Amino acid sequence: MASSHFTPEQLTERFELSSRIRNIVYGLVGVGVILVLIGAFLAQSGDGHHDDSHGEEHAELITENPTIHTVANDQHEDGHGEDSHADEDHGHADSAHSEAHGDDGHGGGHGHHGPTWVTRVLTGFYMSNLYFITIAMGALFFIAVHRVGNAGWQTAIRRVPEAMFGWLPFAAVGALASFLFMDQIFEWIIIPEGQDALIDTKRAYLNPTGFIIRSIIFFGVWILVARMLRRLSTREDTLGGLQNFEKSLGISAGFVVFFAISYSLFAIDWIKSLEPHWFSTIFGVYTFAGSMASAMATLTILVYFLRRQGYMKYVNDSHAQDFNTYMLGFSIFWAYMWVSQ
């Protein structure tokens, strides 16, 4: 089937980095590592300085102007003395709020201390891994939905999104590493039970055990489907016939349904739960739109780069118009979801 459209040279075409590009990539990796180390050093050296200086300035201000402290206390007592006794409901509301958010009014786990430099570094790693996961999942959905729709135009470029979702096993390793420092990132873990009424109502879902189990299931199925679709795709090109196509069609149809459920829950677990007090009923769709827009942008850049390097000469302007249209369409769709929130 595919062999009638592609020459044997095109079917076995493989991209290889030139020495110049390889040196650039290694150089950028080295610069990235250096910047990470510099950022960690600066974050470490800057921990607590802002809070301490603020406290010292406040103490000096009160020492130099003791009347300020007295007047402030008098105003506080006037504002909450008779009024608070006259309105018991208001007093009970304040008391309940203080109990829900800790004695300091900012939550038991994050009221007194800001994020440490270690937390900043781990959070940067966490967000970077999330970014590449969204691109890989957008590429995987792109392949699956076009297989279900029996679209023929994407055959010329499908090796690129297949390479993009090849990142998923590495992303899974990063996700497993993230399990080790969940208690430094997620507020619903940091705040002890009983100190935040709203978070307590969500602990049946937001708990470390459920989070880890769902994540393992999601990544396991995603990686399995990605490997199966990739293997069937190469067999279809080399062996021809409809057997591998029909197998990939069935797998893709089931995956599209699983993707809609799993990716929405993944977005809630890994992104939305970072702000457990915030509500959104369309966050799964919003994340999906962003994934597809990012994946299409990455696909466009890679295809144009490969064509300039002399690869994929069979990709014509019609193909370019199609995936550029996808990029524009999902960018508009993402913007609409963003405004809707």
Predicted regions and their residues:
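Low-complexity, proline/glycine-enriched hydrophobic segments characteristic of transmembrane helices
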Residues: 42-120
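N-terminal signal-anchor module of multipass membrane proteins
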Residues: 2-51, 114-120
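Transmembrane-helix bundle segments that line or gate the permeation/cavity pathway
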Residues: 41-60, 129-238, 255
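Long, contiguous internal "core" modules enriched in hydrophobic/ aromatic residues
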Residues: 25, 84-93, 98-107, 208-210, ...
